[in-house]
Structure formats: C-alpha cells, structure tokens
C-alpha cells in the first residue's frame, strides 16, 4: 500500500504544485494572483514546441487571482488566444527570481507582441500619425536623438523615421526596394529595419543627429475589460466597488473615483434613481461595451440590480474637458494644444462614424482628460436613455429632451439624429475649445437659440480664433446635413492643421 501511495504522489505532484510549497518557505511568488508553480520543472519544460512566444510591451499588475503580472520586456508563452481581449499565458524565466520559474495566468492581449516581430521592437510605433509621433517625441522625458519608426501614411509598405533634434522633430522616409531592403539613400541599403537602426545608432551619416534611445512609450493602452472574468459577465457585484473621491455631480448623478477589487482604479458614475430605465440602459450598454478605440472611454462594467445604477469605466484623472479648459484659461493651453484636443476627439468620433453609431450629446462636458494630454470621448449613446430636466433642454413632441445649444437644427425640429447632427455638435465643441470652455450662445435661452438658428444665425468668430479654425467650425454648421464634412475628413484636417509641404527632410541630404 505504501509503495502505491508513493507512486500516486509522484504522479500527482506536478499537477498539485501548491501542496509542495512547504519544501522551501524562502521562495516569494512575485505575483500572488498567478498559479503556483511546481517545486521543480517537469522534464519536458519549457515545452517550447507548444504555444506562441510574445514580448511584453508595457508593465501590467495583476488585477485578479487569475491574472499574470509582468514587466515590459518579459517573455511570455501564450497558450490560448480564443478570447479577443484576454489570453492565457505562461511567464518564462521570471525576472528577478533567478529560479527559472514559470507562472501562468491571463494577460491583456493589447499589452504584448509576438517575439522577434517588428511590433515587439521598442522603437516601432506602428500606424501612428506624423502629428502623434511628434507629440510623443516631444515629451520632456525624451532627449535629443530619441527616435521611432512608424508606418508611412502616404506610401503603403514604406516606413518613416522620426527623430528628436534639439526640441524639433524631423522626419525621413524609409523606402523599400522591390527585391527587398530598406534605405534612405540608395548608397546605403539594409536588408532589415533592425540593421537600419543598428547602423544609424553608430553614426548619423547624413541624419540630423545620431539615433540614441527609442522614444518612450508613455501612452499605455487600456485593457478592454476589468478582467478576463468580466469580459462577458459584466454585471458585477457592487460590493467589489469602493467609492473613494467624488469628482463631480450633474443632473444625472455623481461621478466618483473608485477602486475595483482592491486593485484597479476606475471611474464610477452613480445615477439618480429614475434617471433611466435599466432595461433601456442595458440594451444600449451592450453595444457601448463592444466599441473599442483609443479615443473612446472604455465601458468596463455595470451594477443595475438596485439603485443607484453604477456605470464603471476607465478613469481619466483630469476630469472633463470643459472644466480643464475653464481652469486653464489660456495659461498653458494654446492653439497647438487646442487643435490636438480637437483632432483626438475627431479620431474617436470617426471610429463611431465607421461603426454607424451616433453619440447624440457631443460636448466638452462629455470629453475626458487623462495623463500626457490624452482626450477621450465619453457618454456616447447615453443621451438615448437618460431622462433629463433642464431649462436649456428642448423637449420635443415625442418627449425626448435635447441640449439645444449643442443640437443640430434638424434634430431639434424632427427629433431625428444622425452622424451629421453629431458633426454640428462637434462644431460647437470647437467653439468651447477655442474659448476655453465658454458657454455657447451666452445669455440666450434654449428657445431664443432655436429662434436664432431658424434665421441662419451662427456663433461669431471668437477674438482669439484663427480664420482657419473658424472655417472648420462653419463647415460643421452647414444648414444642409449632407454638406457637412465627415469626421474622417475633420480628423485629417485637424491632424494636418500645422503641416507644410516640407514636412519630410530631403533625401538629397544623404548624398555626399
């Protein structure tokens, strides 16, 4: 009997690793949320013939017992990619332990890239715009020689090199030969981008400056969900939410900084009882949760089983754009920052446009501000389910109430919304941005605004507003909805607002 037990224990031990931890109490598991590792690796480990190998692009701290913590640069073996947002992965040779341990758990899929791929290189930033490349390189943490490589906006298959030189970002086209190879000038061709980078980190050879360190990746992506468990089951226990600090209040309820599961900072919108029908909200929220874009606030979860209803989203620490603009008043925010705000909002709205989704209440109060000058559109779709009461709200014969000063004339008349009525609202948002959060149609009631709009009145050009910026506003306020620009067009107009024809350095500079 004893020999049978010994053989049975030998068989079960690798599968019951947590039972054998008494052997070495000095071992500290860095991530308490990961699965406990075996005391000793099995003979077939690390099973490098199974799964795909990835590199972490950012740090991630486990949020639940099923998650896996890791740091940028760590190597991970992905075991299951069946869920879009969360993959099951194993940590290979966890740094700092020296024990070759392998820990297992779920990871956000947008935090990793396949090992030895271009996306895994710290200097590769993918399909970002030229303006975004400049903004990221100009962060104070970057020094002269900081650089990144991105996909070319105009030449498919080509790349662009962006370099910081004494506070100025310069761009170079990296061209590709049909037979393979990359070059700035044909006198020096490289078989891979890695060779290209290695060469120009040793010599400038015609560049404005020798390449030094890759641009810091400060803009960390938002996980699609709170955790793997809430990805599909997103009605969560309200006891898992702590309300820490009230950030603001309005006609619908309050907004709080909160903490989920004692691990994850979140924003919590607590709604006044009766402000919406829970069933209507859940139908809309199901769609809202599926909308994923870097410039949209991510809806994480809800608590609807009792009042007050909780809406849990990602946290943006600087509050609404309206308050952010009003508090600054022009002290630090100038035209270049204002155009950037508008471009980021247009980017998020262009995504909604591509998904045939209408916001219905686009305004500075519904744009939120995060770290590193990040702006995201919030509360998209909620106007359809809120029941509101305000003197500047127009109530149609269908008992739907509208924020008149931001609403397109045709939507006021017919109560029919479209992406083109959102474009009108975007024009009002541009007015808010350029005036540092002033109320549009100041001094007018909602009824007076309706009367003035019927006579083709438009907000006048603010004193500090450039003609180019005001022209974009007027395009948004075209009386014919079909004549208003798309958000895609508005996005590129604002992205290229300061651009000239000489945005790329001449490759003749490389010819000796």
Curated annotation (Swiss-Prot):
The keyword Zinc-finger does not apply. InterPro entries: Kinase-like_dom_sf (IPR011009), Non-receptor_tyrosine_kinases (IPR050198), Prot_kinase_dom (IPR000719), Protein_kinase_ATP_BS (IPR017441), Ser-Thr/Tyr_kinase_cat_dom (IPR001245), SH2 (IPR000980), SH2_dom_sf (IPR036860), SH2_Frk (IPR035805). Disruption phenotype: Mice are viable and do not show any histological abnormalities in epithelial tissues or develop any pathological and/or metabolic disorders associated with the failure of epithelial organs. Its main location: cytoplasm. It is an enzyme of class 2 (transferase). Non-receptor tyrosine-protein kinase that negatively regulates cell proliferation. Positively regulates PTEN protein stability through phosphorylation of PTEN on 'Tyr-336', which in turn prevents its ubiquitination and degradation, possibly by reducing its binding to NEDD4. May function as a tumor suppressor. This is Tyrosine-protein kinase FRK. It comes from Mus musculus.
């Amino acid at each position: 009997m004893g020999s049978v037990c010994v053989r049975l224990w030998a068989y079960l031990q690798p599968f019951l690793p947590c039972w054998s931890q008494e052997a070495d109490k000095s071992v500290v598991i860095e991530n308490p949320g990961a699965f406990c590792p075996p005391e000793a690796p099995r003979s077939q480990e690390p099973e490098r013939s199974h799964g795909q190998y990835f590199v972490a692009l950012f740090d991630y701290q486990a949020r639940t017992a099923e998650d896996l913590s890791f740091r940028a640069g760590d190597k991970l073996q992905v075991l299951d990619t069946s869920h879009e947002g969360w993959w099951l992965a194993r940590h290979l040779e966890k740094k700092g332990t020296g024990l070759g341990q392998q820990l297992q758990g779920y990871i956000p899929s947008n935090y990793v890239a396949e090992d030895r791929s271009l996306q895994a290189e710290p200097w590769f930033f993918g399909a970002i715009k030229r303006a975004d490349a400049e903004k990221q390189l100009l962060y104070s943490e970057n020094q002269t020689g900081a650089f990144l490589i991105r996909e070319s906006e105009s030449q498919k298959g080509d790349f662009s090199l962006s370099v910081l030189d004494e506070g100025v970002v310069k761009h170079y086209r990296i061209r590709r030969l049909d037979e393979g190879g990359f070059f700035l000038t044909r006198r020096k061709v490289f078989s891979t981008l890695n060779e290209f980078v290695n060469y120009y980190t040793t010599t400038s050879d015609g560049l404005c400056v020798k390449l030094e360190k890759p641009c810091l990746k400060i803009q960390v992506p938002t996980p699609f969900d709170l955790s793997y468990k809430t990805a599909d089951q997103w009605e969560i226990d309200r006891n898992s939410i702590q309300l820490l600090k009230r950030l603001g209040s309005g006609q619908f309820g309050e907004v709080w900084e909160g903490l989920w599961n004692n691990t994850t900072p979140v924003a919590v919108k607590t709604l006044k009882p009766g402000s919406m029908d829970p069933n209507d909200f859940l139908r809309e929220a199901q769609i809202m949760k599926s909308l994923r874009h870097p410039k949209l606030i991510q809806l994480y979860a809800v608590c609807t089983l009792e009042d007050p209803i909780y809406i849990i989203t990602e946290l943006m620490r600087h509050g609404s754009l309206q308050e952010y603009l009003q508090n600054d008043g022009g002290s630090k925010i100038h035209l270049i920052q204002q155009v950037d705000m508008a471009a980021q909002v247009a980017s998020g709205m262009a995504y909604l446009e591509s998904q045939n989704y209408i916001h219905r209440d686009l305004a500075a109060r519904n744009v939120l501000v995060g770290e590193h000058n990040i702006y995201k559109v919030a509360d998209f779709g909620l106007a359809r389910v809120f029941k509101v009461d305000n003197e500047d709200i127009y109530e149609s014969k269908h008992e739907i109430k509208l924020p008149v000063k931001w609403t397109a004339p045709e939507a006021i008349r017919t109560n029919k919304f479209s992406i083109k009525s959102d474009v009108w609202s975007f024009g009002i948002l541009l007015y808010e941005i350029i005036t540092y959060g002033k109320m549009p149609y100041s001094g007018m009631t909602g009824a007076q605004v309706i009367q003035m709009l019927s006579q083709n009145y438009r907000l006048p050009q603010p004193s500090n507003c450039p003609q180019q910026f005001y022209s974009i506003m007027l395009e948004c306020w075209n009386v014919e909805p079909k004549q208003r620009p798309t958000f895609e067009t508005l996005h590129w107009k604002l992205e290229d607002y300061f651009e000239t024809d000489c945005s790329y350095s001449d490759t003749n500079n490389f010819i000796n």
